[in-house]
């Protein structure tokens, strides 16, 4: 009997794996040949198996898309002639025309359009090739697409509410903006953050771009539009240090230079807190009232003093000698929420919360009989004095004047100054606090920390952190240097609200004494103390600005750009070196609304470098066209 032996002659499995391997090699060869323009090899392979024309790689790209990525116009024409589908979409929803537009390949776009490519197919971000064309410096590509586009496509909004006009202003493209407006683009449309194209133009710092939008027949009507945080174009220009743009905006009769944001801060408050002396001077020359107070009862001079901006203090002190500015309320006796490295700025812009006192006051008011109204009002006065200042001690015992900030519900009323109303005997009304808006300080836009909203219910309600829109959150997520910071500071939005630290803030003294100390080179406030990882304020020497923090403070991360990258395939190998880069960092002012932030929404908008690289700093874009 023969011994059983293994028969290696049966090679069906081997042949099957060999066939699969050769098929993979063939596809790789096809993609490589398409990218390199190897027409002969590509033709021979496709003739053997025409179905290869519709084969897709892991990113959903066909050989035609690879030919577009390699800018091989002859290969594109050959593949189309052999029957390739010109409107196939990849894994990101992009067609071959969309890819060619992202790459700024004018010749390829013309060839695809002549062969029947559709220009109205949006990708998964809702963007048309028209959106992508705004990132290309050559305006001819946009002109070619505009010739094929309808008015609805010109005003098409992507998933972030951005129209091609928004993107043109975002990319600082005056010629593109002019062409879009000429073809019927609507400048009154707002994105999800209620920003118009004029907001983006002002943040770019380009006077020519701003003048193009303002010269449109609808331009003056949007000059007072405020975004979701209540900031108008003048606020943005003041915070960014664009004094020349402020002067241009002021020439429009409809411009309101004293518009109030959600924290009742004027552009002068922002310019003073940011240390923009040129903007402070421009606003004062334009007749801006330097004695207006925000929700914290602080004037622009108080912010300039606290931040140590000597030049701004000199300008504002000459204007406000008639009514001295009161220093910020002392916060020595109350615990403060841990805010990471931004705690110093939160002392400037966040209202000190007195929830323990209010809860105690509520319990006392409920326990007392209704006949003791006079005693209840006295408690309210005492609490109000400890929260705001000592200015109300001279008020009559039966009422206290409080500032009631009305909700801005119409275009005519949202810019009115706060009205004074007497307090009814119903207890202390809730103190509205907002999250810290970032200010341009020391060449960086500092990300805002969130403040808690105080509620006047029976119990001290839970703190609700402000929700930022997806677009506003992305303005803080795409950081270039996400490492190198202490663990406790990696995500200041998720800090433990129960963790507190003691701090020493301003000593209550008159504004004149503070001015004398500042000009005499003496320290104007006490040193801010906190945990070792927090920044410290040191006593300023003569002529030094208080904005300089401790040399041992953590390095402030460069602010990322705010918008989703228009690069079509940021991770695809065959587009290495080719992805389109957005190149402006917007001086972002995040949302301050009191909603719960969604961690799932902290998605990145792209992987592009900050646009501040071309703008000369992370705080403001450049004047490319100046």
From Swiss-Prot:
<dbReference type="InterPro" id="IPR002110">
    <property type="entry name" value="Ankyrin_rpt"/>
</dbReference>
<feature type="compositionally biased region" description="Basic and acidic residues">
    <location>
        <begin position="604"/>
        <end position="614"/>
    </location>
</feature>
<feature type="repeat" description="ANK 6">
    <location>
        <begin position="193"/>
        <end position="222"/>
    </location>
</feature>
<keyword id="KW-0597">Phosphoprotein</keyword>
<feature type="repeat" description="ANK 1">
    <location>
        <begin position="25"/>
        <end position="54"/>
    </location>
</feature>
<keyword id="KW-0040">ANK repeat</keyword>
<feature type="repeat" description="ANK 4">
    <location>
        <begin position="125"/>
        <end position="156"/>
    </location>
</feature>
<feature type="repeat" description="ANK 2">
    <location>
        <begin position="59"/>
        <end position="88"/>
    </location>
</feature>
<dbReference type="InterPro" id="IPR036770">
    <property type="entry name" value="Ankyrin_rpt-contain_sf"/>
</dbReference>
<feature type="region of interest" description="Disordered">
    <location>
        <begin position="455"/>
        <end position="491"/>
    </location>
</feature>
<feature type="modified residue" description="Phosphoserine">
    <location>
        <position position="474"/>
    </location>
</feature>
<feature type="region of interest" description="Disordered">
    <location>
        <begin position="522"/>
        <end position="626"/>
    </location>
</feature>
<feature type="region of interest" description="Disordered">
    <location>
        <begin position="354"/>
        <end position="377"/>
    </location>
</feature>
<keyword id="KW-0677">Repeat</keyword>
<feature type="repeat" description="ANK 3">
    <location>
        <begin position="92"/>
        <end position="124"/>
    </location>
</feature>
<feature type="repeat" description="ANK 5">
    <location>
        <begin position="160"/>
        <end position="189"/>
    </location>
</feature>
<feature type="repeat" description="ANK 8">
    <location>
        <begin position="263"/>
        <end position="292"/>
    </location>
</feature>
<protein>
    <recommendedName>
        <fullName>Ankyrin repeat domain-containing protein 55</fullName>
    </recommendedName>
</protein>
<feature type="compositionally biased region" description="Polar residues">
    <location>
        <begin position="616"/>
        <end position="626"/>
    </location>
</feature>
<feature type="repeat" description="ANK 9">
    <location>
        <begin position="296"/>
        <end position="325"/>
    </location>
</feature>
<dbReference type="Pfam" id="PF12796">
    <property type="entry name" value="Ank_2"/>
</dbReference>
<feature type="repeat" description="ANK 7">
    <location>
        <begin position="229"/>
        <end position="259"/>
    </location>
</feature>
<feature type="compositionally biased region" description="Basic and acidic residues">
    <location>
        <begin position="354"/>
        <end position="372"/>
    </location>
</feature>
<dbReference type="Pfam" id="PF00023">
    <property type="entry name" value="Ank"/>
</dbReference>
């Amino acid at each position: 009997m023969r011994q059983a032996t293994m028969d290696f002659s049966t090679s069906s499995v081997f042949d099957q794996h060999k066939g699969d391997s050769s098929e993979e090699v063939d596809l790789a060869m096809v993609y490589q040949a398409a990218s390199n323009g190897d027409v002969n090899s590509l033709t021979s392979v496709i003739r053997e198996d025409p179905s290869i024309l519709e084969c897709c790689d892991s990113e959903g790209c066909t050989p035609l898309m690879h030919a577009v990525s390699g800018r091989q116009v002859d290969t594109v024409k050959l593949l189309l002639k052999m029957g390739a589908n010109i409107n196939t979409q990849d894994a990101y929803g992009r067609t071959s025309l969309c890819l060619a537009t992202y790459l700024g390949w004018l010749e390829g776009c013309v060839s695809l359009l002549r062969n029947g490519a559709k220009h109205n197919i949006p990708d998964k971000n809702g963007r048309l090739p028209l959106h992508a064309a705004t990132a290309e410096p050559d305006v001819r590509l946009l002109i070619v697409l505009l010739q094929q586009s309808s008015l609805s496509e010109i005003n098409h909004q992507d998933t972030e509410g951005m129209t091609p006009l928004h993107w043109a202003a975002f990319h600082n493209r005056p010629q593109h903006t002019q062409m879009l407006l000429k073809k019927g683009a609507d400048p009154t449309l707002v994105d999800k953050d209620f920003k118009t194209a004029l907001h983006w133009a002002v943040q770019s710092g380009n006077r020519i771009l701003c003048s193009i939008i303002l010269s449109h027949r609808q331009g003056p009507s949007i000059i007072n539009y405020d975004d979701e945080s209540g900031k108008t174009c003048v606020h943005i220009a003041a915070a960014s240090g664009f004094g020349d743009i402020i002067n241009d905006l002021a020439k429009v009769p409809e411009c309101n230079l004293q518009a109030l944001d959600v924290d009742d801060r004027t552009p002068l408050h922002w310019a003073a807190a940011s240390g923009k002396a040129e903007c402070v001077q421009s606003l004062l020359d334009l007749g801006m009232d330097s004695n207006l107070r925000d929700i914290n009862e602080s004037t622009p001079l108080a912010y300039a003093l606290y931040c140590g901006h000597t030049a701004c203090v000199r300008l504002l002190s000459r204007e406000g000698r008639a009514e001295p500015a009161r220093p910020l309320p002392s916060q020595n006796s109350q615990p403060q929420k841990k805010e990471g490295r931004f705690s110093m700025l939160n002392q400037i812009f966040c209202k000190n919360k007195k929830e323990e006192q209010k809860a105690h006051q509520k319990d006392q008011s409920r326990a007392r009989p209704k006949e003791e109204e006079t005693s209840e009002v006295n408690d309210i006065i005492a609490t109000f004095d400890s929260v705001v200042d000592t200015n109300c001690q001279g008020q009559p015992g039966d009422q206290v004047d409080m500032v009631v900030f009305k909700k801005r519900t119409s275009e005519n009323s949202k810019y009115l100054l706060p009205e004074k109303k007497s307090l009814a005997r119903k207890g202390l009304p809730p103190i509205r606090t907002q999250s810290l808006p970032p200010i341009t300080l020391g060449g960086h836009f500092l990300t805002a920390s969130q403040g808690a909203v105080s509620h006047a219910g029976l119990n001290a309600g839970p703190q609700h952190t402000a929700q930022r829109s997806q677009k506003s959150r992305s303005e803080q997520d795409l950081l270039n240097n996400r490492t190198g910071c202490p663990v406790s500071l990696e995500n200041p939005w998720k800090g433990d609200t129960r963790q507190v630290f003691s701090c020493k803030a301003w000593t209550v003294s008159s504004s004149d004494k503070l001015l004398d100390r500042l000009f005499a080179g003496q320290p104007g406030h006490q040193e801010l103390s906190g945990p070792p990882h927090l920044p410290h304020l040191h006593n300023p020497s003569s002529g030094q600005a208080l904005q300089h923090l401790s040399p041992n403070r953590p390095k402030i991360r460069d602010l990322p750009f705010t918008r989703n990258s228009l690069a079509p395939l940021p991770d695809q190998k065959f587009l290495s070196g080719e992805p389109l880069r957005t190149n402006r960092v917007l001086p972002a002012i995040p949302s301050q609304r009191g909603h719960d932030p969604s961690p799932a929404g902290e998605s990145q908008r792209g992987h592009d470098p900050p646009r501040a690289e071309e703008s000369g700093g992370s705080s403001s874009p450049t004047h490319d066209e100046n």
